[in-house]
């Protein structure tokens, strides 16, 4: 089993929530980093700030499926839209523990920062569906 931090369209009530079917929700959390608006989903980047999301426990098979959803090509970082990395939870579920998350792995020039790091709040503010 793997602990995974999600922060965008995989969260409950958002567009890709069905991809999390069968995963165990551990609760809300915050991790270090910053968010950008990639178009119809966010991208987490390394940097100052915090990102709001949720932690789930997933099986090996679920994690492999989520790698596909996030367009992560194992062993080929340059070809991957996101890259799965470990981060340490700052607050909330599993605080102080390492968890997997998907870090955006493409150029970010021209992308809009999501300064507060909360994708749910952001889509409400800009009036966008997930």
Q: Can you describe what each PLM-predicted range is?
A:
Residues 1-130:
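Glycine-aromatic micro-motifs
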């Amino acid at each position: 089993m793997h602990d995974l931090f999600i922060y965008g369209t995989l969260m409950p009530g958002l567009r890709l929530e069905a991809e999390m079917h069968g995963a165990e929700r551990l609760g809300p959390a915050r991790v270090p980093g910053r968010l950008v608006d990639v178009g119809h989903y966010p991208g987490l980047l390394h940097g100052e700030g915090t990102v709001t999301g949720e932690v789930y426990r997933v099986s090996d098979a679920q994690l492999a499926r989520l790698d596909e959803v996030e367009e992560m090509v194992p062993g080929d970082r340059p070809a991957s839209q996101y890259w799965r990395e470990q981060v340490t939870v700052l607050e909330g579920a599993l605080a102080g523990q390492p968890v997997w998350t998907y870090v955006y792995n493409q150029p970010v020039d021209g992308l809009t920062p999501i300064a507060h790091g909360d994708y749910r709040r952001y889509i409400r503010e800009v009036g966008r569906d997930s």
